[in-house]
């Protein structure tokens, strides 16, 4: 990987991590179309530290409030006394499924599931499920029922969204896509679904990034070029990730996810055609 490729992949990671179109799919597709080597699951996990930093900074006030409430309520012997501490514990509970599945299927995630067959299937499948979730949300709105706020999320909601997040281990699914979809089915409004999705991503993205950084440290530090490329990709992922968060939260206040559904279908079908005609190797 050269510096130009690192910059492009960092931008791709930042732009697509928080939109429901799958960053892992695009980090697999873009190199394939450009004739570059697959950067691999480890690169994806490490560069996600950049988008993790974007979430931390964008939601700094929320995170400080949640962490402060968890610590304060624990010291009082009432761990679930406030809405903020409940949210913190729900994020922790919702993280358990992706940790379990991530460890159980680690080898498949890094090899078999990176096939463009899986990527295209996941892009199309989630587009269809998200379209059903959107119809459910539209029906609720027509009935005059408002969506849940974060403080109204139940333990069942958190666990269902957490299990959905585990599906994002399949490239093409999209972490934000599956969690926003689950949130819509659980009657969260679109913006709240996205906001909870981003907060829920913090523990697992941090853990995966640190693990892959530790695991590949010798390779990364084997040359100055490797270190520079990873660092540059991570910085660009942070910048464009921050912009992506701001865009999506603003967009979902007034619009549905329809544009992303259409994009996923178009991309998934295009991939199948390109693979079938021999223009792209799976």
Swiss-Prot record:
Name of a matching Pfam family: BacA
Membrane topology field: Multi-pass membrane protein
Keywords attached to this entry: Antibiotic resistance, Cell inner membrane, Cell membrane, Cell shape, Cell wall biogenesis/degradation, Hydrolase, Membrane, Peptidoglycan synthesis, Transmembrane, Transmembrane helix
One GO cellular component term: plasma membrane
TM spans (from-to): 40-60, 89-109, 113-133, 150-170, 196-216, 230-250, 258-278
Coiled coil: none
BP term (GO), one: cell wall organization
Cellular compartments annotated: Cell inner membrane
Example GO molecular function: undecaprenyl-diphosphatase activity
Domain of life: Bacteria
Catalytic activity: di-trans,octa-cis-undecaprenyl diphosphate + H2O = di-trans,octa-cis-undecaprenyl phosphate + phosphate + H(+)
EC numbers: 3.6.1.27
Family: Belongs to the UppP family.
Note in the entry: Bacitracin is thought to be involved in the inhibition of peptidoglycan synthesis by sequestering undecaprenyl diphosphate, thereby reducing the pool of lipid carrier available.
Function comment: Catalyzes the dephosphorylation of undecaprenyl diphosphate (UPP). Confers resistance to bacitracin.
NCBIfam families assigned: PRK00281.2-1 (NF001392), undec_PP_bacA (TIGR00753)
Descriptive protein name: Undecaprenyl-diphosphatase
């Amino acid at each position: 990987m050269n510096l130009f490729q690192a910059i492009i992949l960092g931008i791709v990671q930042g732009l697509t991590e928080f939109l429901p179109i799958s960053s892992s799919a695009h980090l697999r597709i873009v190199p394939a179309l450009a004739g570059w080597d697959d950067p691999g699951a480890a690169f994806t996990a490490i560069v996600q530290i950049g988008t993790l930093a974007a979430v931390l900074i964008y939601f700094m006030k929320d995170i400080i409030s949640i962490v402060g409430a968890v610590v304060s309520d624990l010291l009082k012997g009432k761990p679930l006394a406030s809405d903020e501490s409940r949210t913190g514990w729900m994020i922790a509970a919702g993280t358990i499924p992706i940790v379990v599945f991530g460890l159980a299927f680690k080898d498949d995630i890094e090899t078999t599931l990176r096939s463009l067959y899986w990527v295209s299937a996941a892009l199309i499948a989630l587009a269809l499920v998200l379209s059903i979730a959107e119809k459910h949300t539209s029906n609720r709105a027509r009935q005059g029922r408002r969506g849940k706020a974060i403080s109204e999320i139940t333990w069942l909601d958190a666990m269902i969204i957490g299990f959905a997040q585990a599906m994002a281990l399949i490239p093409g699914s999209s972490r934000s896509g599956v969690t926003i979809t689950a949130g819509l089915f659980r009657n969260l409004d679109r913006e709240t679904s996205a906001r909870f999705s981003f907060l829920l991503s913090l523990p697992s993205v941090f853990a995966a990034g640190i693990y892959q950084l530790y695991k590949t440290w010798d390779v990364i530090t084997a040359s100055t070029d490797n270190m520079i490329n990873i660092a540059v990709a991570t910085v660009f992922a942070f910048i464009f990730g921050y912009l992506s968060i701001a865009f999506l939260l603003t967009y979902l206040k007034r619009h549905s996810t329809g544009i992303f559904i259409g994009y996923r279908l178009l991309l998934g079908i295009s991939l199948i055609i390109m693979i079938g005609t021999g223009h792209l190797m799976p």
